[in-house]
From Swiss-Prot:
Pfam families: TIM. This is Triosephosphate isomerase. It catalyses: D-glyceraldehyde 3-phosphate = dihydroxyacetone phosphate. The gene is tpiA. Keywords: Cytoplasm, Gluconeogenesis, Glycolysis, Isomerase. The lineage of its organism: Archaea, Thermoproteota, Thermoprotei, Sulfolobales, Sulfolobaceae. GO terms for molecular function: triose-phosphate isomerase activity. One of its GO terms (biological process) is glyceraldehyde-3-phosphate biosynthetic process. Its EC number is 5.3.1.1.
Length: 230
């Protein structure tokens, strides 16, 4: 994982699984190859193996459970997603919250397995406590803006700038910004404010031409990083 980080969360939209999921993945992969930029796709557990086999994108799970292997019906463990082909996992999304102790345990096992992790938080005050658990990145997403099309970089720029101040107190943990990220301009602004990348979902998954949305994201992410001299 290296900036600019572009993470697309497939969630559980109708095109997040099956043939439609493969189609949108291929479109995203084309953009990734054209611009030489890594794009992370966080996909349903049932699609991890298929997407990792049929594309060269970095595939993440959307969640993993804490706890050991054993009599744990329905659990999705780090060992399982690695075996399926995932290279990491999203954790603690506002739609799938977990306790801090569960987060710490999952992150430890993710590291042992040489997987990567992106942990979501809903406010800047949580950035440092979570970053101290040593994920690869912390994604700040004010929940009231998720799925609204109102970007955090415009509606709450201070959430990003304050989060940047917090992440600088740690080492080797990236800061991503999400919630309402819809256009390349939103991406540019988020990175200009100090984020190392972005997370998005509905802007891509609900788009008529998702490849154009992703291309807009990537072009502006690259431009913003160049402006920062990185």
């Amino acid at each position: 994982m290296k900036p600019p980080v572009i993470l697309i969360n497939y969630k559980a939209y109708e095109n997040s699984y099956g043939k439609k999921s493969i189609e949108i993945t291929k479109k995203i992969e084309k953009v990734s190859k054209e611009y030489g930029t890594e794009i992370i796709v966080s996909v349903p557990a049932t699609m991890i193996h298929r997407i990792s086999e049929e594309s060269e994108l970095t595939v993440f799970a959307q969640h993993v459970d804490s706890g050991e292997q054993g009599a744990r019906t329905g659990a999705i463990l780090p060992e399982m997603i690695k075996d399926a082909g995932a290279r990491g996992s999203l954790l603690n999304h506002s739609e799938r919250r977990i306790r801090l102790d569960e987060m710490a345990e999952s992150l430890e096992r993710i590291r042992v397995l040489n997987l990567e992790s992106v942990v979501c938080v809903d406010r800047y005050e949580l950035v440092l406590p979570v970053a101290l658990l040593r994920p690869n990145a912390v994604l700040i997403e004010p929940p009231e803006l998720i799925g609204t099309g109102i970007p955090v970089s415009k509606a709450k720029p201070e959430a990003i700038t304050k989060a940047v101040e917090e992440i600088k107190k740690t080492k080797d943990v990236y800061l991503l910004a999400g919630a309402g990220i819809t256009t390349g301009e939103d991406v540019f602004k988020a990175i200009e404010l100090g984020a190392d990348g972005i997370g998005a979902a509905s802007a891509v998954m609900k788009a008529k031409e998702p490849e154009k949305v992703v291309e807009d994201f990537v072009k502006n992410a690259i431009k913003a990083m160049e402006k920062r001299g990185e």
